[in-house]
Regions:
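Extracytoplasmic loops and strand-loop junctions of Gram-negative outer membrane beta-barrel proteins
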Residues: 62-64, 92-96, 130-134, 194-204, ...
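Short acidic/polar hinge/loop motifs at secondary-structure boundaries
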Residues: 7-8, 35-66, 83-85, 190
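Residue-level detector of the transmembrane beta-barrel scaffold of outer-membrane proteins
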Residues: 29-31, 61, 92-94, 122-126, ...
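Outer-membrane beta-barrel domain signature
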Residues: 7, 67-71, 97-101, 136-138, ...
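N-terminal periplasmic accessory domains that precede
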Residues: 16-19, 47-51, 60-62, 74-97, ...
């Protein structure tokens, strides 16, 4: 099973706690332009840092465990490399508006890319917003903005420099686990013990606020037809 397919299964069947090859997520690595972005404390990649940037993160390569590739030695859980070089995005613009009845109810995204211009420059930008005054679970809310900006200069057939920065400031109310007895008394399996009324207004006691602004710079050097040097430095 390829990483792309298993990622889809992991998202769609997350309540079943799907795991690639049975390994925990810290055994799967996620790279961006060749730089490992797994958290140094948990060992896991935080998908919240690229939340709402679907168009900006579409260019990716996925590998299985120990599979031959050009960006890592290959961990036992597989790896993914997201390519955020501006010249790799198709020229044009895209606007999308969607609704759902899960964590958020409304999502808007806009992406624009120049493609590779005649002067060797390429620019790509993306903005996104996800919102819910209250999700399908009572007492939850969702307020998230996301941005992405990339620029690249292709000097010739051998050298190019690129820069990308992105972030997704998010604030959301969490749902909490409960017991079958509580669900029975509430007459609903959507019962959420994390919320209540304070001064006549709904208040969630578990609010998550996250923001990991990130940036990465890359230099690509095609030494010859059989050898390439890719150097990247990033931070978050």
């Amino acid at each position: 099973m390829c990483i792309r397919d298993s990622s889809n299964v992991g998202y769609l069947f997350s309540p079943m706690r799907f795991r690639v090859r049975g390994y925990n997520s810290q055994y799967s690595d996620t790279y961006i332009n060749g730089v490992l972005f797994n958290d140094v404390e948990t060992g896991r990649f935080s998908y919240g840092m690229i939340g709402g940037l679907n168009d900006a993160t579409r260019n990716k390569e996925g590998i299985g465990a120990f599979e031959v590739n050009n960006f890592t030695f290959g961990p036992i859980g597989g790896a993914t490399n997201i390519n955020m070089r501006a010249s790799q995005y198709a020229a044009g613009s895209k606007l999308s508006l969607s609704g759902c009845n899960r964590n958020y109810i409304l999502r808007g995204m806009y992406t624009y890319s120049t493609g590779l211009l005649k002067n060797g420059w390429a620019f790509t930008g993306s903005l996104g917003y996800r919102w819910a005054n209250e999700g399908v679970i009572e007492g939850t809310f969702y307020n998230a903005f996301s941005y992405f900006l990339a620029a690249e200069k292709v000097f010739n057939d051998k050298h190019s420099l690129s820069f990308a920065t992105w972030g997704a400031p998010t604030e959301r109310g969490q749902q909490g686990a409960s017991t079958e007895e509580a669900y029975y008394l509430a007459n609903s399996h959507y019962y959420n013990p994390n919320w209540g009324y304070q001064n006549g207004e709904k208040r969630n006691s578990r609010v998550v606020r996250s923001f990991e602004p990130s940036a990465i710079a890359s230099w690509d050097f095609d030494i010859n037809k059989e050898m390439k040097l890719k150097t990247s430095a990033g931070f978050k």
